[in-house]
């Protein structure tokens, strides 16, 4: 589907996509909605309610659960209910398999729904593997091994897009410095949107997470080697204490890597990720990585309070005693 033509013909104000497979798309698996900044979230939620009652996409109608980008506001949910998908499958009048995705446009005239199939490419464009560097610790490093790389067209650039869950964050300043030096083969940082506060704990945020879009540095020498390795540094956020637990497991979905061969618009527009053009997507297993984040155990809350207060009181009287002795010796 030609994205620009669709917008022009139907007056579309909202783009909507459900990705059920992590192997054939620019976007990771989940519900993705992109809307114009002039539309409010309540209007979007109303449109979904009119399709069928009791559609439960958490936080859809709340403005602070939409991530603002220069190209519009984005809603993302990793959870896709079967009921939610079935509505749009019915509107597309076709069964959906694992190599397809739902693509829908909402305009004043209603919904225009289609089911997209990404064709098998005659040109092998590459694949990739990911793993977390050991030890994982509080500052995990995502190691990416891109291999069997073949640039489909001369003007194509190798790009990656990933969703960062609210339990983790990336440091835009750290990444900018890495990209400036082309360290770890990281090229330009095309965009970081969402919850990017470097100090805020998870319980102080809305829980939308963040999106990271970036270039991989390539040259003829690297492509001749047939593989490129890169490292994406991540950081864990402070979590709320839980009773009986000392670790909180969080999931990190694999990033998506693809060749961006869109020469019509040199501006890296988020809407490109919703289009069906140039599906030169690198293949990988749709695995999810697990990270264990240390947290405080509420079972020991009272013990910690008593010990902390005891140390503070002891330190206070120790300092008083020390000062009194100094004063006494000075007087003598």
UniProtKB/Swiss-Prot annotation:
Claim: Glycosyltransferase is one of the keywords in the record: no
Topological region Lumenal: 1-301
Alphabetized UniProt keyword annotations: Cell wall biogenesis/degradation, Endoplasmic reticulum, Glycoprotein, GPI-anchor biosynthesis, Membrane, Transmembrane, Transmembrane helix
Coiled coil: none
InterPro entries per the UniProt record, alphabetical: Pbn1, PIG-X/PBN1
Pathway membership: Glycolipid biosynthesis; glycosylphosphatidylinositol-anchor biosynthesis
One GO-annotated biological process of the protein: cell wall organization
Membrane topology label: Single-pass type III membrane protein
Gene Ontology CC terms, in alphabetical order: endoplasmic reticulum membrane; glycosylphosphatidylinositol-mannosyltransferase I complex
Residues listed as glycosylation sites in the UniProt record: 36, 56, 112, 206
Residue intervals on the Cytoplasmic side: 325-332
Localization terms from the record: Endoplasmic reticulum membrane
Domain of life according to the entry: Eukaryota
Molecular function in Gene Ontology: enzyme regulator activity
Pfam entry (one): PIG-X
Residues annotated as transmembrane: 302-324
Similarity-based family: Belongs to the PIGX family.
Protein task: Required for proper folding and/or the stability of a subset of proteins in the endoplasmic reticulum. Component of glycosylphosphatidylinositol-mannosyltransferase 1 which transfers the first of the 4 mannoses in the GPI-anchor precursors during GPI-anchor biosynthesis. Probably acts by stabilizing the mannosyltransferase gpi14.
Protein name per the record: Protein pbn1
Organism phylogeny: Eukaryota, Fungi, Dikarya, Ascomycota, Taphrinomycotina
């Amino acid at each position: 589907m030609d994205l620009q033509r669709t917008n022009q013909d139907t007056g579309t104000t909202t783009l909507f996509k459900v990705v059920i497979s992590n192997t054939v798309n620019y976007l990771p698996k989940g519900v993705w909605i992109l809307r114009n900044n002039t539309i409010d979230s309540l209007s979007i939620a109303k449109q979904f309610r009119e399709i069928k009652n009791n559609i439960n996409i958490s936080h859809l109608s709340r403005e602070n659960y939409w991530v603002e980008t220069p190209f519009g506001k984005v809603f993302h949910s990793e959870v896709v209910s079967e009921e939610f998908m079935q509505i749009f499958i019915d509107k597309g009048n076709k069964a959906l398999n694992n190599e397809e995705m739902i693509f829908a446009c909402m305009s004043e005239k209603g919904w225009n729904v289609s089911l997209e199939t990404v064709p098998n490419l005659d040109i092998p464009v590459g694949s990739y593997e990911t793993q977390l560097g050991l030890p994982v610790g509080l500052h995990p490093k995502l190691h990416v091994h891109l291999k069997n790389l073949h640039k489909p067209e001369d003007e194509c650039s190798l790009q990656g897009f990933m969703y960062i869950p609210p339990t983790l964050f990336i440091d835009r300043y750290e990444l900018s410095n890495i990209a400036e030096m082309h360290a770890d083969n990281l090229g330009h940082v095309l965009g970081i949107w969402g919850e990017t506060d470097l100090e805020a704990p998870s319980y102080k945020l809305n829980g939308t997470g963040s999106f990271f879009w970036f270039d991989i540095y390539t040259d003829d020498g690297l492509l001749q080697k047939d593989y490129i390795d890169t490292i994406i540094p991540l950081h864990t956020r402070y979590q709320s204490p839980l009773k009986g637990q000392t670790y909180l497991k969080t999931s990190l979905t694999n990033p998506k890597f693809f060749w961006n061969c869109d020469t019509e618009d040199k501006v890296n527009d988020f809407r490109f990720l919703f289009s069906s053009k140039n599906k030169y997507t690198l293949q990988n297993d749709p695995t999810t990585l697990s990270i264990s984040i240390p947290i405080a155990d509420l079972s020991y809350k009272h013990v910690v309070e008593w010990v902390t207060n005891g140390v503070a009181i002891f330190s206070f009287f120790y300092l008083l005693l020390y000062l009194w002795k100094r004063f006494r010796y000075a007087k003598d």
